[in-house]
Amino acid sequence: VILSVRSASSTFGDNIMRHLLAILIATVWISIHEFVRNQLVLADHWADHYTAMGLAFPSAPVNGAVWGIWALVLVIAIHFLARRGGLLETAAIAWIMGFVLMWLVIGNMGVLPLCILPVAVPWSMVEVIGAVYIVQKFRSRVPSRQA
């Protein structure tokens, strides 16, 4: 009986660690892509667009921290969606929730430079598919909850 309790406890702890590691790695994956895409590849487009509006592009450390929180929340949503969906289904829902809705809002506010979308759309799709893959790979030993 003691052995089975330890075994169950160890399995539970292993599962929790697997989930947390999946979330951490996928969050880092998304954060790296966001930084490279927006702060390196498309930085001039963002800066020019904001300058044309008479604004400075928000690039203070606190802005980066908020984007880190956004990435974490997106990955947590992916984690729960992945329990019931396959790779492409989960990625499609997560991409719409995380990116399409964001672009609609910031586009409506006039702060989205539309010229970035030909690069941002496919890149963000790869980004989300990669995050879903990471989450599913690390969760592969954890049974999914089918309805």
Describe the predicted segments one by one.
Residues V5, F12-A147:
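Juxtamembrane/disordered regions of integral membrane proteins
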